[in-house]
Amino acid sequence: TLLLRMCMMKTANLVAKFIKCQCLITGESLGQVASQTLENMAVTESCCELPLLRPLVGMDKEEIVTIAKEIGTYETSILPYEDCCVLFSPKHPVIKAKLEDAHTLYNALNVDDLIQEAFKNREIKMFSARNYVWENFNN
């Protein structure tokens, strides 16, 4: 899962730079899942060239669910499907990855060309919560 997250971060960087974003924002919350320990989040962040913001990092699940309901993303988040993190999740995930080891394994996969190919064949769809957030910010 951690190597997959490294790939996703590298891909997100390419897309973000292409659409001229100044940062990446994730929904990670410290300790919620195995990939979200300090050590593992450091590994994921090491693949990020842009500033990485984690506004939910110190929130518990209940707080995150409340926010998701407020911004209209909760119903989507509970749809029953197996995403890539579930399908490829190891039985005993690493919770304290070592940065050097993670990069050694990542480099052995030789996926950078695949990431470039995926980016080349990208399809970008833009979604904005700006109006919702702004309306609620002013109330």
What are these regions (language model features)?
Residues L52, Y74, I95:
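Glycine-rich, flexible loop/turn motifs
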Residues Q36-E39, F88-H92:
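Short secondary-structure transition/capping segments
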Residues S46, V94-L109, E117, E123-N139:
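RNA-binding accessory domains that recognize and position tRNA/RNA substrates
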Residues Q32, P80-F88:
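Small/polar glycine-rich anion-binding or flexible loop at a beta-alpha turn
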Residues G72-Y81:
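A short alpha-helix-loop-beta-strand transition element characteristic
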Residues T1-T66, E70-I71, L114, F119-Y132:
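Active-site adenylate/phosphate-handling loop in enzymes that bind or generate adenylated species
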